[in-house]
Amino acid sequence: MICAPTGSGKTTVAKTLLLKRGWVLGFFNKALDETAKDFGPEWERLKDWPRFGIDTRQNRLMLWPATKANVSETIAHHSDVFRRAVDAVHVQGHRTLFFDETHYLTGMCGLGREIEYFHYFGRSNNITCVTNMQRPRWVPKIIMSSVTHAYIGRTFDKDDLRHLSNLGGVDATE
């Protein structure tokens, strides 16, 4: 889990971590994200999920759907593309999944159940999740309770601090 305010280097931290992993699929959504665009030549960018899936030998994939004419169309398009990808990964297994802006994916794109599923059952299917988020209280609880490694940037929001104090299932009052 990587949790920090916007502009604090979450994507840069993720890039460093993901280069240490094999078989990575990143879910990207910000049209003009210069940091993500600079991930490097070893990453293959996909604008859509291939109809017949991907070649399992493809090692580093950035699933980065196009922005549409308006916000509603963009969210609907992203939801469709990302949902087809998570369904395929569920069957294939053996991937590290990077979710950029997890709240956008779980909330606006409606992928909360799918991302929760990977946090509950992914390990037994050789799936690792790396989640980027700006606010810990806006993502499903299972993400916070299944964290094994965390990078946490500065926050002064009391609700966020309370959520972070329970990281890994530890009661903040203990």
Positions of PLM-derived features:
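Conserved P-loop NTPase motor cores
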Residues: 1-19, 72-172
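Walker A/P-loop NTP-binding active-site region of P-loop NTPases
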Residues: 8-49
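Short, well-ordered alpha-helix to beta-strand connector turns
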Residues: 21-22, 57-60, 147-148
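Structural motif
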Residues: 24-25, 60-62, 96
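Residues at the C-termini of beta-strands that transition into short coil/loop
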Residues: 28, 47, 66-67, 154
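Short loop/helix-cap segments at secondary-structure boundaries that form the rim of catalytic
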Residues: 33-40, 54-56, 140-145
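Short glycine/proline-enriched loop/turn "hinge" motifs that connect secondary-structure elements
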Residues: 52-56, 89-92
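Conserved P-loop NTPase mechanochemical-coupling segment
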Residues: 53-77
